[in-house]
A protein has these predicted regions:
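Short coil-to-helix segment of the ABC ATPase nucleotide-binding domain corresponding to the Q-loop/switch region
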Residues: 11-18
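Conserved ABC ATPase "signature" region
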Residues: 25-42
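Conserved ABC ATPase signature
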Residues: 46-50, 54-56
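Hydrophobic anchor residue at the start of the ABC signature
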Residues: 60
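Conserved catalytic motifs of ABC-family nucleotide-binding domains
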Residues: 67
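Catalytic Walker B motif of ABC-type/P-loop ATPase nucleotide-binding domains
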Residues: 71-74
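Helical segment within the ABC ATPase nucleotide-binding domain
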Residues: 86-98
Length: 144
């Protein structure tokens, strides 16, 4: 999941997600993903009809519907409001717990580190610190 959404402008939200689901071996359920990211009401809209945060949630849905073993996220909640951020983080947490997806989140938001198993901090392109998180905070309880 990148900061640039790369949505296909001539496809609806649902079609943008289906493109990926159709080539995936074991995709997640479309309705579950749309509901979890609170974008089910936009399923027939085109990207140009969505806000930046809504477009970001569609891009996240495209990545998640594949049911990947590894999910790399660059500023996952960067364009999202607090409510949407929490929804996305709860769904990522569920993917990790329920489906065993390894999630790597690159972020400047220190609060998100609270839900991580391991926190790796970089400085000047080098690992400056690596910590195991002994007190994980559920996504629902993060102060974002």
């Amino acid at each position: 999941v990148f900061q640039f959404y790369n949505l296909i402008p001539d496809l609806t939200v649902e079609e943008n997600i289906e493109v990926v689901a159709d080539i995936s071996a074991h995709p997640l359920d479309m309705d579950e993903v749309l509901r979890a990211l609170d974008i089910e009401k936009y399923r027939r809209r085109f990207p140009k009809e969505l806000s930046g945060g809504q477009q970001q949630r569609v891009a996240i849905a495209r990545a998640m519907i594949k049911n990947p073993k590894l999910l790399l996220c660059d500023e996952l909640t960067g364009a999202l409001d607090t409510k949407s951020s929490r929804q996305v983080l709860k769904f990522v947490e569920k993917m990790n717990r329920q489906f065993g997806t390894t999630v790597v989140i690159i972020t400047h938001n220190e609060a998100i580190a609270g839900m991580a198993d391991q926190v790796i901090r970089l400085k000047d392109g080098q690992v400056s610190e690596s910590l195991l998180n002994q007190r994980k905070i559920p996504a629902a309880e993060l102060v974002l």
